[in-house]
Amino acid sequence: RCMMDLATIGAKELKKQGILKNLDESDEINACTVKIKCDVNGKDEDWLFLFKNETHNHPTEIEPFGGAATCIGGAIRDPLSGRSYVYQAMRVTGAGDPLKPVSETLPGKLPQRKLVTTAAAGYSSYGNQIGLATGQVDEIYHPGYVAKRMEIGAVVGATPASHVRRECPAPGDVIVLLGGRTGRDGVGGATGSSKAHKLDSLEHCGAEVQKGNAPIERKLQRLFRREDACRM
């Protein structure tokens, strides 16, 4: 019925057949999580292995630096919320021909060369600041990406299973918010990719793209490596 069904149908079928036995499931899962054995100084330990990807096609099309930066930042956020340390990433993007003259740019669009170079700068800026190794970078050039750019960031994280405490939320629970300061940037961004756009969207929708804060997320990554912090 939707793209999410296509993304999850394989795991559902494997689970139905009883083949997928190491899947970690709970009410809070925000990233694909599997149970693994990890060799730590010659001793097997129970760990959780987390995968997550995020697409920022629309934000990067509108504001390429911030869109690509928060693509990787948002992908990191989800395994991080599972108390894991994200240690590697992959970037796969799609664009039109960046060598075409700027004069051939479609009305209401940024030139492909601008999208390609500025998005690359945004992704690398965030990745370098947070200290994340991106082992695979691949950009696909095809006319089909002229109408809408493709921007995908994928990450892998891991954490000792003993660092994760599973509980269900209940009335009266105290909620602690962690992260950088927020402003009015990003308001409307969640629905921006689903609404109809006009020729002047490029001029008015840039504020819908949130501003990332890699140094703060870097601090959160380090905080959550401490068992006493992530088990609170």
Task: Please provide the spans of the model-predicted regions.
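Glycine/proline-enriched, intrinsically flexible loops and inter-domain linkers
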Residues: 1-232
